[in-house]
Design a protein with these regions (language model features):
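Residues forming the flavin
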Residues: 1-131
Length: 131
């Protein structure tokens, strides 16, 4: 993170950890990061821990998933696909877990449309940066 913005990822290798090898993690710089880790919201959770109270959610932290409601989950997955912290976007079930939508339900349609939506958002943001 730089200046209150996600600017990439640090990737730890589980195989390296299991083998007890001393290998540094990979550092990847990126203009945007998408958390599509599903229910666990792994990337959003790390940001929440490192910069408490800064997420763009009603409670400024991960809202958590609500009970299963397939019909609602389909539409809310799309609505919740957005930027949650500068440079960090959420998609799929990570979006519902972050913004408090119902768990499960969006099996194919909502999940695919969520990925398409976040890709379009990033393309738009990248083209706006070039101007």
């Amino acid at each position: 993170m730089r200046k209150s913005r996600v600017t990439g990822l640090v990737l730890n290798w589980s195989a390296v950890e299991i083998a007890h090898l001393h290998v540094d993690p990979l550092a990847v710089r990126s203009q945007f990061v998408v958390d599509a880790t599903g229910h666990e919201t792994a990337v959003v959770r790390l940001v929440q821990d490192k910069v408490p109270g800064k997420l763009k959610t009603p409670s400024v932290k991960i809202e958590g998933e609500k009970s299963m409601w397939s019909d609602k989950a389909e539409s809310l997955t799309l609505r919740n696909t957005r930027e949650v912290f500068p440079g960090l976007y959420v998609a799929g079930m990570a979006a519902n877990a972050t913004f408090g939508g119902p768990r499960m339900g969006p099996i194919f349609g909502g999940m695919l449309l969520s990925g398409e939506k976040v890709a379009d958002m990033l393309l738009h943001a990248l083209s706006a940066k070039k101007r």
